[in-house]
Amino acid sequence: PASVAAACGIDAFIHAEEAYISTAASPFSDAMAEKAMSLIGRNIRRFVANRGDIEAAESMLVGSLFAGIAFSFARLGNVHAMSHPVSAFFDVPHGVANAVLLPVIAEYNALADHGRYLTIYNDISPVPAYAEEFEPMMLVDAIRELCGEIGIPENLTEAINNASKTGPVSAEEIENKIEAMTVDA
């Protein structure tokens, strides 16, 4: 289904993105991450729209492999660290939790960007940007746009309620579980 393709595809992209901005990144992990982000970023929309598109599927597959190699050498970051408890406490699919958290964490990390956000932006945005005009918040907006185009919920509350098997989850319930997550961390 398209929803599974979107969740798995964005998860693979985030594997590469987190490896690329990791403090443990190296020239080798960067090469793997850059190729992964390019392959996935340029094909995820096509693949989610048509899982029978063999060319897009192959690019997603190879991109996912390169992303796995990249994060094996450079590690993951805050997106994955925060998404695992969200998935465990709320039954939100892993890739969806990652995708919902990515723009928030990218915005938080924007002040620490040393030019890598531009590369990531150009891999996912249909409109290229150049260094002279680029601002890190452009990446945050492009992530939100991509996620919206492939059917990812806009925020954590929406993702939690979409995943709920017992009906709507109140803001208070979400807040209480998040508080419990921070205590357990």
What are these regions (language model features)?
Residues 86-176:
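Gly/Pro-rich interdomain helix-loop hinge
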